Amino acid sequence: ETAVVQPSRIARLERGVPRQDISLYQYYRHLVVSIDYIKSERNRDRFLNAAPDLIIVDEAHTASRTRGGKNVRQQQRFEFLKQLARDPSRHFIMTTATPHSGIEGSFRSILGLLDESFDTDPDQRLDRKKLTPHVIQRRRRDIVNWLGADTHFPDRVTADREYQLSPEYSSLFEDIVTYCRETVAATAGAGTYRKRVRFWAAVSILRSALSSPRAAEAMLEKRRARKRGTEDVDSPSDEAFASQILDSSDSEETPDYIPTAAFDDAGFSDSEIRRLDGFLKRAQGLSGPEKDGKVRAAAEEVDRLLGEGYSPIVFCRFIDTARYVAEQLQAILGNKHRGLVARSVTGDDGGDQERKVLVGELSEESVRVLVATDCLSEGVNLQEH
C-alpha cells in the first residue's frame, strides 16, 4: 500500500498501523512525502530510523547545497538528504530537469549524495569515467516515444513583441540611468565594498524601473526605510546580491520580491535621497495603459489570446509587477471579455499547497488570465488548468 504523508492525513495513517511499537514509516511499504515535512524537527528522527532502502527525490536541484547557506530551507533539505545518504546500502534516485544551473558547487553537492568523492572543489576535474554510471540524461527529443507511448510534448513557439516607452516613462528611465551612472562613478575612490554595494543598488533600481511602474514605486518606497551605511566592513558577496537581483536558472529558487538587499549599506546622501524621492513621485503617475506601453502591449497580446479561446498565463519577475499587471488586465479587458477574471499568484501567497488551491480556483472560471511569478514554474502543471 502507498501512503501519502501529509499533516491532514497523519492521524488516519497512524490509526491504520496495527501495532504501537512500529511507526507508520515502518509499516507502509511505499511512502510519498514532502521533504520539507519530513525534515522538520518533529518528524526527522522518526523517518531516519525507519527510512526505506530506496529513496526517489523529485526536483533534486531544490535540495542542493546553497552558496554560503543563504537559503536556510534549501540548506536543511541538503543536510537531511546527506544524513540519509550515509547508509551505503541505501539506493538513491534523484530526478531533476535542471541538475546544473551554472553553479558548479551546487551541482557537485547533488553528485556527492551519490558518492562523496564527487563533492570536490569546483576547480578540480571530475572523473567522467567514474561519474558515467551514476548519471542518466534524457532530453525531450529522447522521450517523444517512451515505453511504447507518445508523450505529446507541446510545441514551443517563441516570438518577441516590441513596445514603445511613453515620453514620461522614457524620461524617467533616462534620468534613472543617468543617476545610476553617476552614483557608480562617484565611488571611484571608495573601498571595494562600497563600490560593489553601489553597483548592485543601481542594478536593482534599473531592473525595477523596467519591470513596471509599481515595481519601481515599491523599490523606491522601500529605499526610504534604509539607513545610511558604513564604510568597508564584512560584507555579503556579489553572489548574495546577484541571487536577489538577476534572473537565474540556479538550483535555488529565484526570489520574486523587490531586491532591496543592496540598499542596506548603500550610504545615500541627503541629496541622493531627495533625487530618489523625485523618481518615486514620477513613477507613481505612470500606471495604466496611457503611460505604460509595456502593460498596454501585454493587454493587446492577452486580448488576442482570449479571443482565440486560450486561457493565457503571464509571467512576471516581481510580485509587485504581477499584482499590477493582473489589476490592469482586469481593468483594460474586463468589459470586452465578459466574465473575465485576471488573478495574480506569487510567492507572497503562501506555500505550494496554497498556491495550487488558488490556481485550481481560477481554473474554474470560464474566461481567465493567470499572472504569476516564477514560484509557479515548478510543482504545478499549469497546462492542466
Predicted regions: what they are:
Residues 20, 27, 32-52, 64, ...:
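Inter-lobe coupling linker of SF2 helicases/translocases
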Residues 23-25, 46-49, 84-89, 304-307, ...:
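Conserved catalytic network of the ASCE P-loop NTPase/AAA+ motor domain
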Residues 5-15, 35-40, 316-320, 340-356, ...:
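Conserved helicase motor
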